[in-house]
A protein has these predicted regions:
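Donor-binding and catalytic core of enzymes assembling or modifying cell-surface/extracellular glycoconjugates
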Residues: 176-262
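A short, glycine/small-residue-rich beta-strand->loop->alpha-helix junction that serves as a flexible
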Residues: 11-20, 154, 158
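Histidine-anchored nucleotide/phosphate-binding helix
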Residues: 19-30, 165-173
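Active-site regions of enzymes building and remodeling cell-envelope glycoconjugates
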Residues: 53-56, 196-206, 250-252, 268-278
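Nucleotide-activated donor-dependent transferases that construct or modify glycoconjugates
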Residues: 1-12
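Gly/Pro- and small hydrophobic-enriched strand-loop and loop-to-helix capping segments
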Residues: 30-42, 235, 247-278
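Secretory-pathway luminal glycosyltransferase catalytic domains
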Residues: 1, 45-171, 175, 283-290
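Short His-Asn-centered micro-motif
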Residues: 9-11, 39-40, 146-147, 183-186, ...
Length: 290
């Protein structure tokens, strides 16, 4: 890379927003012969660094440094970047500040899945993944369930109540009593409600408080376990499950209360992946309906 050709990606808000900005920026930077640097803004209370979650060998820039660069003529490209400025290639430094994935030089959406799949999780995340995997999921078919009930978008709360998940889980269990569920939930109350109605499920319990390092590491572990499922019941209007789908290289079907997909547990007999840290390497069964 040429040392003075850089792209700084300013990441903020939730994990899904941050990762799609940083990883699409990484893909764009590579395509344009630029070095990637990134801002991991902790002003919203996000305690962990990106390097607490994945090994990420790129330079982190402070929000203050990024804002000073803005004041000295390196302004942010913001929001949905549909078209790069005509002179962008001549700029030694580009700063992007958005919650959306970038588009490439031709204006097409960047597929940042390959960059996600090349990341290596930290030992703390790996330990969480294998604790759940070895205890309840290894060698079994399972369906992922991801519930957003804490500080969720109003569209998510309205369209994806806990009762909808419970109803679908009961139907899937009736189809195949041997199917296990892996539950990813951001609410202890929702987790209890599911277990009371459906019975025991695979779920992380020692997850810590919202936005703490422990909690976000647990969320990353959830992503890999959801990615290794035969299919996922997910919330409407959420950026979390799409990360798991990219980890699986789009091999999992995601059903929510508003889309046309419908999972089936009929005929699921074995695991979908052999290594939960590599959910893109699929084995056989998938839970999509005909």
């Amino acid at each position: 890379m040429v040392a003075d050709r850089r792209l700084i990606a300013y990441a903020q808000l939730g994990l899904g927003n941050r990762m799609r900005v940083i990883l699409s920026s990484l893909a764009y930077a590579r395509s344009q012969n630029r070095d990637l640097e990134y801002v991991w803004d902790s002003s919203v209370g996000m305690k962990p660094a990106l390097t607490d979650l994945w090994r990420f060998p790129y330079r982190r820039v402070s929000p203050l440094r990024s804002r000073l660069l803005q004041l000295t003529g390196h302004g942010y490209l913001k929001d949905r970047i549909a078209e790069w400025p005509s002179d962008v290639d001549r700029k030694p430094l580009i700063q992007v500040k958005t919650v959306h994935a970038l588009k490439d030089a031709a204006g097409e959406p960047i597929d940042w899945g390959p960059q996600l799949r090349e990341l290596e999780t930290t030992p703390a995340v790996q330990d969480r993944v294998f604790r759940i995997w070895n205890d309840r999921l290894a060698g079994r078919p399972y369906i992922g369930v991801q519930i957003r009930a804490h500080d969720a978008h109003p569209k998510t709360v309205e369209a994806s109540p806990v009762e909808w998940f419970i109803g679908r889980m009961q139907e899937l269990r009736a189809d195949n009593p041997d199917v296990e569920f892996f539950l990813s939930s951001d609410s202890e109350a929702a987790t209890k409600q599911v277990i009371d109605a459906v019975g025991p499920v695979a779920v992380q319990t020692d997850i810590g408080d919202y936005h703490t390092t422990k909690r976000v590491q647990a969320a990353v572990a959830d992503l890999y376990l959801l990615g290794g499922a035969a299919g996922v019941l997910g919330p409407y209007w959420s950026s979390f499950v799409p990360i798991a789908r990219r980890l699986a290289d789009d091999a999992i079907v995601v059903e929510d209360s508003r889309n046309d997909h419908r999972l089936s547990a009929v005929g699921l007999e074995g695991p979908s992946v052999a290594d939960p840290l590599r959910p893109w390497e699929r084995m056989n069964d998938r839970a999509d309906s005909a």
